[in-house]
Amino acid sequence: MAVQKSRVTPSRRGQRRSHDALTAKQLSTDPTSGEIHLRHHITADGYYRGKKVITTKSSAVQED
């Protein structure tokens, strides 16, 4: 069984935990469709930075 060599002080414990805080997700709005998406990710419609980069099933059905 692992046993620590010496007791960890509250200050040291707090310094270790200082990087564990949760942050809110960064969201962006696409200029073409106005859809909200994660930064640096394409939208559900297949747009990235205002340009169509991938054909999705929903857009293929609408075009037919």
Curated annotation (Swiss-Prot):
SUPFAM superfamilies: Zn-binding ribosomal proteins (SSF57829). GO terms for cellular component: large ribosomal subunit. It holds the Pfam family Ribosomal_L32p. Keywords: Ribonucleoprotein, Ribosomal protein. One of its GO terms (molecular function) is structural constituent of ribosome. One of its GO terms (biological process) is translation. Belongs to the bacterial ribosomal protein bL32 family. PANTHER family: 50S RIBOSOMAL PROTEIN L32 (PTHR35534), LARGE RIBOSOMAL SUBUNIT PROTEIN BL32 (PTHR35534:SF1). This is Large ribosomal subunit protein bL32. It comes from Xanthomonas oryzae pv. oryzae (strain KACC10331 / KXO85).
